[in-house]
């Protein structure tokens, strides 16, 4: 029987399945951070259980680390306690930890792929909703809750029901300057923020194959923002070339054998999906969200929509509420909307290619008066690479702040946050009310678009910036 990529990955990991019971899946990799793990380790301790597979468990600090200092006390008492607990727990249970002073420390979904922890064909979990990022490698990756974190630590397995399948095909080639962020925002604009609920999404089509691994990670990172359980891109030569030579990747003949298997991780011809969505890449312009969920998104050259134009009463009410919160009026061109802050970072867009794209816009320009712009690399290796290329100097000369790695203003768990009423052009993944700070207003954009907003003081079409 013809199978989708998701079905192949799921079936290959079923440990046990009884009639009328939820299947038990084997978990290949478990990524851990300081926020969702303390109670899980406490549970192990209370029952006298070890970590079943410490060699398949990797930890880092990211959510509430300071991006201005490596001082563990810098972001308040709760942050300090969570980080100290992670140090204690990893030491006690034999888990490898990339702490504040480790050169590999960074956002968990940046660290995993760049260290070769993430490989095609794997099941990967983390107590974090954006674990879907790792699906870019053709791995089944999804977020779990703290009780499930404990279960995986104890057993290296997890009960998981089968999801429905969705194919999202982006046909043709994207125009110059159009990034994975624009593509995924356009997709969510079409499906809505709940369009993928109950599904695992496979992204395919020429525009997807053209993306680098970093672009594919951006794409899969935001699968969760359309309500999907996970996002997938089938592995190909782009994937294999990225993985080869990384710290935890197979070496020599083992790598060749792995690639031979990874090449089978494609959806079979004739396999059926529960839902199919198609977009034309050439129709996608730079995207900017205007509301309070990622599905409320338009092209940069469009006007803010009028809630009255929505036929669905629920959508209309949502749009009215969003515009009130965002302090926007219908009919205003997006390019006339001024911004206060810019955040370039997060597990969506903090990799080296993202920083290069932003630096290209920043080079030779200055951050607009009254705008604060932060650049937060996703990990120690990304920061080191950017500095080796001189990107930090470009940003600093333009008036951007060059920070240490961490999740930062994406979710405002450290000291990087918006004040009430402040408007931010952000490369992160969520524009919910209060996400970047109480009363803060978030617009999601690509790194180049964020840099353009920083230097112009308002949203600007990067296609017009020479």
UniProtKB/Swiss-Prot annotation:
<keyword id="KW-0100">Branched-chain amino acid biosynthesis</keyword>
<keyword id="KW-0004">4Fe-4S</keyword>
<feature type="binding site">
    <location>
        <position position="347"/>
    </location>
    <ligand>
        <name>[4Fe-4S] cluster</name>
    </ligand>
</feature>
<keyword id="KW-0028">Amino-acid biosynthesis</keyword>
<keyword id="KW-0411">Iron-sulfur</keyword>
<dbReference type="InterPro" id="IPR050067">
    <property type="entry name" value="IPM_dehydratase_rel_enz"/>
</dbReference>
<keyword id="KW-0408">Iron</keyword>
<keyword id="KW-0479">Metal-binding</keyword>
<comment type="subunit">
    <text>Heterodimer of LeuC and LeuD.</text>
</comment>
<dbReference type="GO" id="GO:0051539">
    <property type="term" value="F:4 iron, 4 sulfur cluster binding"/>
</dbReference>
<dbReference type="GO" id="GO:0003861">
    <property type="term" value="F:3-isopropylmalate dehydratase activity"/>
</dbReference>
<feature type="binding site">
    <location>
        <position position="410"/>
    </location>
    <ligand>
        <name>[4Fe-4S] cluster</name>
    </ligand>
</feature>
<dbReference type="InterPro" id="IPR033941">
    <property type="entry name" value="IPMI_cat"/>
</dbReference>
<keyword id="KW-0456">Lyase</keyword>
<dbReference type="InterPro" id="IPR001030">
    <property type="entry name" value="Acoase/IPM_deHydtase_lsu_aba"/>
</dbReference>
<comment type="similarity">
    <text>Belongs to the aconitase/IPM isomerase family. LeuC type 1 subfamily.</text>
</comment>
<dbReference type="InterPro" id="IPR004430">
    <property type="entry name" value="3-IsopropMal_deHydase_lsu"/>
</dbReference>
<dbReference type="GO" id="GO:0009098">
    <property type="term" value="P:L-leucine biosynthetic process"/>
</dbReference>
<keyword id="KW-0432">Leucine biosynthesis</keyword>
<dbReference type="GO" id="GO:0046872">
    <property type="term" value="F:metal ion binding"/>
</dbReference>
<dbReference type="InterPro" id="IPR036008">
    <property type="entry name" value="Aconitase_4Fe-4S_dom"/>
</dbReference>
<comment type="function">
    <text>Catalyzes the isomerization between 2-isopropylmalate and 3-isopropylmalate, via the formation of 2-isopropylmaleate.</text>
</comment>
<dbReference type="InterPro" id="IPR015931">
    <property type="entry name" value="Acnase/IPM_dHydase_lsu_aba_1/3"/>
</dbReference>
<dbReference type="InterPro" id="IPR018136">
    <property type="entry name" value="Aconitase_4Fe-4S_BS"/>
</dbReference>
<dbReference type="Pfam" id="PF00330">
    <property type="entry name" value="Aconitase"/>
</dbReference>
<protein>
    <recommendedName>
        <fullName>3-isopropylmalate dehydratase large subunit</fullName>
        <ecNumber>4.2.1.33</ecNumber>
    </recommendedName>
</protein>
<feature type="binding site">
    <location>
        <position position="407"/>
    </location>
    <ligand>
        <name>[4Fe-4S] cluster</name>
    </ligand>
</feature>
<comment type="pathway">
    <text>Amino-acid biosynthesis; L-leucine biosynthesis; L-leucine from 3-methyl-2-oxobutanoate: step 2/4.</text>
</comment>
């Amino acid at each position: 029987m013809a199978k989708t990529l998701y079905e192949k990955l799921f079936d290959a990991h079923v440990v046990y399945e009884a009639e009328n019971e939820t299947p038990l899946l084997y978990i290949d990799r478990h990524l851990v951070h300081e926020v969702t793990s303390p109670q899980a380790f406490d549970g192990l301790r209370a029952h006298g259980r070890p970590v079943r597979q410490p060699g398949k468990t990797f930890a880092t600090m990211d959510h509430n680390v300071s991006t201005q200092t490596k001082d563990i006390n810098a972001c308040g008492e709760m942050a300090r306690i969570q980080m100290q607990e992670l140090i204690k727990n990893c030491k006690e249970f034999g888990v490898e930890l990339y702490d504040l002073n480790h050169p590999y420390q960074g956002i968990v979904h940046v660290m995993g792929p760049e260290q070769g922890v993430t490989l095609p064909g794997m099941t990967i979990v983390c107590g974090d909703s954006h674990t879907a990022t790792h699906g870019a490698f053709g791995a089944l990756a999804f977020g779990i809750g703290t009780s499930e974190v404990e279960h995986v630590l104890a057993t290296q397995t997890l009960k998981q029901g089968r999801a429905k399948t969705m194919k999202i095909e982006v046909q043709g080639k994207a125009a110059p300057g159009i990034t994975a962020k624009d593509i995924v925002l356009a997709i969510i604009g079409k499906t809505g923020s709940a369009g993928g609920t109950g599904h695992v999404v496979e992204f395919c089509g020429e525009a997807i194959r053209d993306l680098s691994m970093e672009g594919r990670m951006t794409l899969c990172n935001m699968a969760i923002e359309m309500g999907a359980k996970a996002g997938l891109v089938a592995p190909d030569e782009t994937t294999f070339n990225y993985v080869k030579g990384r710290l935890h990747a197979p070496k020599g003949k083992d790598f060749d054998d792995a690639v031979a298997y990874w090449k089978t991780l494609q959806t079979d011809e004739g396999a059926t999906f529960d839902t199919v969505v198609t977009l034309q890449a050439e129709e996608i312009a730079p995207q900017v969200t205007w509301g309070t969920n990622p599905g409320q998104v338009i092209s940069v050259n469009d006007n803010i929509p009028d809630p009255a134009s929505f036929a669905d009463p629920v959508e209309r009410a949502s749009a009215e509420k969003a515009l009130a919160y965002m302090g926007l009026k219908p009919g205003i061109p997006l390019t006339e909307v001024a911004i206060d802050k810019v955040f370039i970072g997060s597990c969506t867009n903090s990799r080296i290619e993202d920083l290069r794209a932003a630096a290209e816009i920043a080079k030779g320009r200055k951050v607009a008066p009254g705008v604060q712009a932060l650049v937060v690399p996703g990990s120690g290796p990304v920061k080191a690479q950017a500095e080796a290329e001189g990107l930090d100097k470009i940003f600093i000369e333009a008036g951007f702040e060059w920070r240490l790695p961490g999740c930062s203003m994406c979710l405002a768990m450290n000291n990087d946050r918006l004040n009430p009423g402040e408007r931010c052009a952000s490369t992160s993944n969520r524009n919910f009310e209060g996400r970047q700070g109480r009363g803060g207003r978030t617009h999601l954009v690509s790194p180049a678009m964020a840099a353009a907003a920083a230097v112009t003081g308002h949203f600007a079409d990067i296609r017009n910036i020479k």
